[in-house]
Amino acid sequence: MATPLSISSNPLTSRHCYRLHLSSTSFKGNVSVLGANPSQILSLKLNQTLKTRNQQQFARPLVVVSQTAATSSAVVAPERFRLDNLGPQPGSRKKQKRKGRGISAGQGASCGFGMRGQKSRSGPGIMRGFEGGQTALYRRLPKLRGIAGGMRSGLPKYLPVNIKDIETAGFQEGDEVSLETLKQKGLINPSGRERKLPLKILGTGELSMKLTFKARAFSTQAKEKLEASGCTLTVLPGRKKWVKPSVAKNQARADEYFAKKRAAAAEAATSEPAASA
């Protein structure tokens, strides 16, 4: 006679209660409704799943967030460049329009040039500056011949230095003030185009010592102040402009002619008082 199977009156007591909690989400699951398995395969699988998730949680890379980026909602860990993740930036490679490939492509029938008109025909198109028949802008404006002052208008012609800067530069009594000595003192540091410019002394400030100045130009105020303080002023000659030999010959002849004319006028002016006496 077969022995009857004994069944428990409370089936819930023979079941194991499992709770699932994923660290990456806020989901909590209850698997208490699952029946017990004598082989305990389910419990082993659940334990392995929990272990792997814990290992993944602790194996995440440490990311340091600055105070300015603390308000950002998500922090993306840096990723190494590999051949499988290289690609252009989004939006940098725009898809080319396929013109003349049917109306479904968007530029099929007239290719974006419209139905009729000069702009839809072949050829050079309209002229530059055309405004549809009205007087064009280049015809409405007056014609200006050249540039006022020439192409070099507004560019500096001298390296200016004031008297007050020379006073505080550390010069001693009787020293020479020139372009080279001012460079050594650090008052000027020309670069580029300014390296070819001459020196000009300006009259802002006062000077309490006697110095020797060598410059291309002096302002009116600077000249008066320096002469009053007993300084020696030397005006350096400018760089001669190159001219053709024929032009130089004509200029020399003109200078000689006007020199003779001035000498004759001076001689006549001196002889008139003697004749009247």
Swiss-Prot record:
Q: Which GO terms describe its biological process?
A: translation
Q: GO molecular function terms here?
A: mRNA binding; structural constituent of ribosome
> Positions modified as N-acetylthreonine?
T68
Q: Which Gene3D superfamilies does this chain map to? A: 3.100.10.10
Q: Where is the transit peptide?
A: 1-67
Locate the compositionally biased regions of type Basic residues. Answer: 92-101
Can you tell which superkingdom this protein's organism belongs to?
Eukaryota
Keyword terms of this UniProt record: Acetylation, Chloroplast, Plastid, Ribonucleoprotein, Ribosomal protein, Transit peptide
Q: Which GO terms describe its cellular component?
A: chloroplast; chloroplast envelope; chloroplast stroma; cytosol; plastid large ribosomal subunit
Stretches the record annotates as Disordered = 81-125
Q: Does the keyword Transit peptide apply?
A: yes
Q: Where in the cell is it found?
A: Plastid, Chloroplast
Q: What is its main location?
A: plastid
Composition bias of kind Gly residues appears in 103-115
SUPFAM superfamilies documented for this protein: Ribosomal proteins L15p and L18e
* The protein's assembly and partners: Part of the 50S ribosomal subunit.
* Xref: PANTHER family: 50S RIBOSOMAL PROTEIN L15 (PTHR12934), LARGE RIBOSOMAL SUBUNIT PROTEIN UL15M (PTHR12934:SF11)
Q: What is stated as this protein's family in its record?
A: Belongs to the universal ribosomal protein uL15 family.
Q: What is this protein called?
A: Large ribosomal subunit protein uL15c
